[in-house]
Amino acid sequence: MMRKLAVLVLAVAMVAACGGGVVGVAGAGCNAGQLTVCTGAIAGGARPTAACCSSLRAQQGCFCQFAKDPRYGRYVNSPNARKAVSSCGIALPTCH
């Protein structure tokens, strides 16, 4: 699991570096690559860092888009991701 997550984080960073991590016009400003600072929290359930919480807040409006994206959905919807969001005091949106 940790190896898969490490590969995903690397892939997200590479996609983001190439501009592919930015979601279309409706999601202008959405960049999954900014969430790589949350790897420890999402991968191992560690307490999220201040940088992670800041990135989660900045991308909060994008959570549903990330959850629906096949590249990120299973990680965004994971129990550890939900725990990290909650630990940062961020409300989880209801996605439709």
Swiss-Prot record:
<feature type="disulfide bond">
    <location>
        <begin position="64"/>
        <end position="95"/>
    </location>
</feature>
<dbReference type="InterPro" id="IPR033872">
    <property type="entry name" value="nsLTP2"/>
</dbReference>
<keyword id="KW-0813">Transport</keyword>
<feature type="disulfide bond">
    <location>
        <begin position="38"/>
        <end position="52"/>
    </location>
</feature>
<dbReference type="InterPro" id="IPR036312">
    <property type="entry name" value="Bifun_inhib/LTP/seed_sf"/>
</dbReference>
<dbReference type="GO" id="GO:0008289">
    <property type="term" value="F:lipid binding"/>
</dbReference>
<comment type="function">
    <text>Transfer lipids across membranes. May play a role in plant defense or in the biosynthesis of cuticle layers.</text>
</comment>
<feature type="disulfide bond">
    <location>
        <begin position="53"/>
        <end position="88"/>
    </location>
</feature>
<protein>
    <recommendedName>
        <fullName>Non-specific lipid-transfer protein 2</fullName>
    </recommendedName>
</protein>
<feature type="signal peptide">
    <location>
        <begin position="1"/>
        <end position="27"/>
    </location>
</feature>
<feature type="disulfide bond">
    <location>
        <begin position="30"/>
        <end position="62"/>
    </location>
</feature>
<comment type="similarity">
    <text>Belongs to the plant LTP family. B11E subfamily.</text>
</comment>
<keyword id="KW-0446">Lipid-binding</keyword>
<dbReference type="GO" id="GO:0006869">
    <property type="term" value="P:lipid transport"/>
</dbReference>
<keyword id="KW-1015">Disulfide bond</keyword>
<dbReference type="Pfam" id="PF00234">
    <property type="entry name" value="Tryp_alpha_amyl"/>
</dbReference>
<keyword id="KW-0732">Signal</keyword>
<dbReference type="InterPro" id="IPR016140">
    <property type="entry name" value="Bifunc_inhib/LTP/seed_store"/>
</dbReference>
